[in-house]
Regions:
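Ser/Thr-rich, Pro/Gly/Ala-heavy low-complexity intrinsically disordered linkers and tails
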Residues: 1-36
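Extracytoplasmic/lumenal domain signature
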Residues: 30-584
Length: 584
């Protein structure tokens, strides 16, 4: 390895005034782009550079104008068994297109879900009946599952479902799915923007649209948090109890982070907390290192979601472990805010145990001001939970992005990007890197040892320019993955398809054709691209869902299908933040 400077000067790029900071050691990278081969990313002996993507077609659905798209990464799946993949594209309506761009099915806006579809839809056979299901969440507390039957979509029996709670019918902004209890059926977790006193933000549904209730559990498992006391209740857990507040941006992941065989539901909140729920709805206990400092509940244990996370590890040690010194003050120290911070689950250090990865914005001052985005890796509760919710060794000092330009109160559009952590091996040994688009205008790659490996400034000096979640795929069959993402802003022709090498070098920066005005929401690509071989010819298509002009499809000549470690939003069509580095 060879040291390489990063930052605005070294990269000759425009970025925010503050520089990013590394974690455990100096910023390093692999200048030759070397990456060890793994079973999930094999070479097809490709020997030519990545070819420039070729635009194929645009789709708008059942009308001449395009509905507004949000963060719902398209789903690419063979619905009818013909060897070609269809495109599931949620806007306000939900469209299904074939590989050639023809509209096959439409669920119109407000038919079953209200308003926009913000989060990526889950695409899976939920109940194992051989029929593909598509699950989408809307506003007004609505969630719907559809079945693909007889060449079209129909509402699945038992659906739509409701996420109404404590007098609010909020928007579903996050969705992830997985077989939580190992019975062969897939549960769907939905997180909402509920802010009511006593309101629940996390709902888990069975394939039949009913709230999930694991066998043998005597208390109502979901939704959470609840207002019950005693066994299975949240109101008096560890004495103090717990409550949540608003999940605003794809705030849910799923994965096994403890000693049993069941998967946990990982949720981040707008109250500076991150929680891990077991399948029965109860919370995972944090390590004994963390105890309550409040005089009323002094030395009581804490669950994952019962304490604010602070950026400085010494602050957390003094406050939650030693119980010494002044209580933390937001005016002088940064806390971690998880407002729109999707969690992913993966084995970062290669020890065979999963960690939780998130990129909260680190805030300070009153009113709160983001100082940067903190790449965070927390250990699970394996081995009896002795290090549960603690920082992975080497990650005590969190790698931090540059400071984004503050936005004025009420400046909502275009919306900030969602800092979803992509966890995949792009450099060096088989341990994964963390790649993410950050709202300081840069894409970051952070190594498993908490080193910032490289950054690429996608904004190039343009104000209020953001990027989608990236995807990681090999586009020239050499077994070395590329990074693919889109950009958006409010400016004319802000939408671009960008492709980087695994070392962060720009390969292509392509303005999208036929861009619109975005209706004041945004212009370009807010949702993660999706990449697959749509038409069965052995080469890959890149599918982009846009704010302003529908769905664009590009083909990449000379590409292959043997290395697609993170090909769609949140890693897979279950949208649960799992990739090849996840340990089942």
């Amino acid at each position: 390895m060879k040291a390489r400077l990063i930052g605005c000067v070294a990269l000759a790029l425009a970025c925010s005034s503050a520089k990013p900071t590394g974690g455990a050691g100096p910023s390093t990278t692999f200048p030759d782009g070397r990456v060890d081969q793994t079973t999930t990313c094999g070479s097809e002996e490709g020997a030519v550079p990545v070819a420039q993507p070729v635009f194929l077609h645009n789709m708008k659905g059942d009308k001449s104008w395009a509905e507004t798209g949000w963060f719902s990464s398209p789903g690419l799946v063979d619905l009818n068994g013909d060897g070609k993949r269809e495109i599931v594209a949620p806007f306000y309506s939900l469209f299904v297109f074939d590989a050639a761009g023809n509209t096959l099915a439409t669920i119109k806006q407000d038919a079953y879900t209200k308003g926009r579809i913000y989060a990526p839809a889950v695409v899976a056979d939920l109940d194992g009946d051989g029929t593909i299901d598509i699950v989408a969440a809307g506003n007004e507390g609505t969630v719907a599952a559809y079945e693909w039957k007889n060449g079209t979509l129909t509402i699945k029996s038992g659906w739509p479902a409701s996420t109404a709670s404590a007098g609010q019918s909020p928007e579903g902004r996050g969705m992830a799915a997985g077989d939580l209890d190992g019975d062969g059926k897939i549960e769907v977790a939905v997180t909402t923007t509920n802010t009511a006193d006593g309101g629940a933000q996390v709902f888990v549904f069975s394939p039949n649209g009913q709230l999930f209730q694991p066998a043998g559990v005597s208390w109502p498992a979901w939704p959470r948090y609840n207002t019950r006391k005693g066994v299975g209740g949240d109101a008096d857990t560890n004495g103090e109890g717990k409550s949540g507040y608003g999940c605003y941006g794809l705030n849910v992941g799923i994965g096994n982070i403890d000693d049993d065989a069941q998967q946990e539901v990982i949720v981040t909140y707008d109250n500076h907390e991150i929680n891990a729920f077991k399948a029965d709805g109860t919370s995972v206990r944090a390590a004994p290192y963390f105890t309550n400092r409040s005089s009323q509940y002094l030395n009581q244990p804490l669950d994952w979601g019962q304490f604010i996370r602070w950026a400085d590890p010494q602050v957390e040690e003094n406050h939650y472990h030693l119980h010494i010194g002044d209580w933390p003050d937001i005016n002088t120290t940064m806390w971690l805010q998880w407002t729109a911070s999707p969690p992913s689950v993966a084995d970062v250090d290669g020890d065979g145990q999963n960690e939780v990865i998130g990129i909260p914005n680190a805030e300070m001052k009153d009113p709160y001001e983001t100082q940067g985005y903190a790449f965070t890796v927390l250990q699970g509760a394996q081995g009896g939970g002795g290090r549960s919710a603690m920082r992975l060794p080497g990650w005590e000092t969190l790698p931090m992005s540059a400071k984004p330009v503050p936005r004025a109160n009420g400046d909502w559009y275009p919306p900030d990007g969602v800092p979803a952590p992509v966890v995949a091996n792009i450099l060096g040994d088989p341990r994964p890197e963390i790649v993410a688009a950050i709202n300081d205008g840069a894409i970051y790659a952070v190594g498993p040892d908490a080193q910032i490996l490289w950054q690429y400034n996608y904004a190039k000096g343009a104000a209020k320019t953001f990027a989608s979640e990236p995807v990681v795929v090999d586009l020239n069959r050499d077994g070395v993955p590329e990074i693919v993402f889109g950009t958006y802003a409010l400016s004319t022709n802000a939408g671009r398809l960008v492709i980087l090498s695994n070392t962060g070098a720009e390969l292509f920066d392509i303005p999208l054709p036929g861009q619109g005005d975005g209706g004041g929401n945004g212009i370009g690509v807010p949702a993660a691209p999706s990449v697959a071989d749509l038409d069965g010819d052995g080469t890959l298509e890149i599918v982009l869902l846009t704010f302003d002009h529908g769905v664009d499809v590009f083909n990449v000549p000379g590409s292959g299908t043997k290395c697609l470690p993170w090909p769609t939003g949140r890693g897979n069509l279950l949208r649960n933040g799992q990739g090849p580095a996840y340990v089942p």
